[in-house]
């Protein structure tokens, strides 16, 4: 067996040292004398040609060194990306990389039932459900156990099993083996734990289509009528600020109402998720729809400021969370491989709703001269569209509600949702901080754009048009973000988009004064400003284990919610009305600084993610090297594989080395992550 020592890092180190020696030799040469005599003395032509030749050879050598260095880096990155692509067909890897709240709920429910029964769960694959080679080994015939009848359960467990698994209790161990039924093991893949139908004991993978597209349309409607409608509040805010609608109200009051809806929408998400597990999905959404209708209708009759706080602030915020959170849990049950596409289509609702309700709100305000009929029409239209979504929404494998009869079961749901163990994981805290800064800047920019346009001398119609363009760009940008994240890496895409947003805030928004300039700004920013909303869930899935996903998701939502409450209040406090040239300059700078903070945090998260992935691959490489040493191969292919493993070992040892230089090297290492 021969070994290859020409790995890329050792070669590159030699090249860099060679370059350094050449540069040092140039720097250590005799200094040039600039005396009059030396200037006047003629230089022989042969010396000039020799000097030019030496300079050219040095430049050529440096150029070759850099070229070889870049080629070696490209080779290393391609090797890592190839290893990532090798797992792209593994259904279990796909699920873990796209893990969602609905998957976490099903996993929690299945494990809860399993612990209560204290019996092995039976699994069988349905027709058409296929796994890739890495996952299918768990379901092969060799994993089937013949002695399932040897398990001794209590009488209560037997009775519950007869109710849940009537088919499996009618067969002997040999009959179960013939059906392809296996016992549940602790190290089973996540896809088996999540998509096992508890009523039949069968593994049922999502169909990636069919009625799932109707469900996608339903989620689109809920996003259209909740966050999409709320995105048009910037038009209402501009109207309230420019008209004395509620005597005695300050700009901070209206700003606080704007922040209240976003604050409650994020803060209540974990509580709504627990409520849905207790009373059921449809009941929760119907309750939220009723609250929404009442909120807008009551807001249209308000005459005092506190009434507006209660209706358009508190009640609307609660209704948004009660409607959209349960709806988003249905979609993952219908899609797995096409989940990013389905999620992207459903997210179109936020941007589309902002366009429609933004333009409609401005039109109704100009026609009616007040917000009364505007709020009534919005409330009725939103509640009807949500009712349509509830009627058509269908869970593929519904998780039964636990009901109100068991306080202990309800407490267990809250305990699982608000587990404080996730705080001990620093990367979860980093995700929460990143999400807070990015969402803070997003809301500040969205709610301020309309008022900023009016301060620059534009009409209210132009201001609402800018808001509509911004939301329309979001409807295109958000689906593309999800697809780009799956192709190029979530952290990579997030860093690129956050960098662009930082540039747009400082280099485009501040100098933009005309309507045309603000149109282009709205298009550019709208295409990438929703990056936090799109990427927060998948980044959590990349960082935590499936069993820890639910409390981590809850923590990310409620951790940054209080800051969203005062988001627009801070924007108004930073406004300098005496500065006629640009009263929102300080708010714009603060918004850009928030994106800078988000960029720093996501860069730290990227380094951590790369370190985890490289550490895992380093361990796998070392294990394979041990296996190769223990075995004997004398073929060309074996020799080639040995060389590749040695190159990988050297690469991982270098990248995972200690020191600040290695830390930043991992941070900028251009692999898909």
Swiss-Prot record:
Keyword line: Endoplasmic reticulum, Glycoprotein, Membrane, Phosphoprotein, Symport, Transmembrane, Transmembrane helix, Transport
Molecular function (Gene Ontology), one example: symporter activity
Cytoplasmic side: 1-208, 277, 337-339, 394-426, 526-549, 606-673
Domain of life: Eukaryota
Annotated glycosylation sites: 230, 471, 492
Chain ranges passing through the membrane: 209-229, 256-276, 278-298, 316-336, 340-360, 373-393, 427-447, 505-525, 550-570, 585-605
Subcellular location: Endoplasmic reticulum membrane
Signal peptide: none
Topology feature Lumenal, residues: 230-255, 299-315, 361-372, 448-504, 571-584
Gene Ontology CC annotations of this record: cell periphery; endoplasmic reticulum; endoplasmic reticulum membrane; mitochondrion; plasma membrane
CDD domains from the UniProt entry: MFS_MCT_SLC16 (cd17352)
Membrane topology: Multi-pass membrane protein
Pfam families assigned: MFS_1
InterPro entries (UniProt xref): MFS (IPR011701), MFS_trans_sf (IPR036259), Proton-linked_MCT (IPR050327)
Modified residues (Phosphoserine): 57, 112, 172, 637
PANTHER family assigned: MONOCARBOXYLATE TRANSPORTER, TRANSPORTER MCH2-RELATED
Sequence similarity: Belongs to the major facilitator superfamily. Monocarboxylate porter (TC 2.A.1.13) family.
Record's protein name: Uncharacterized transporter ESBP6
UniProt organism field: Saccharomyces cerevisiae (strain ATCC 204508 / S288c) (Baker's yeast)
Lineage of producing organism: Eukaryota, Fungi, Dikarya, Ascomycota, Saccharomycotina
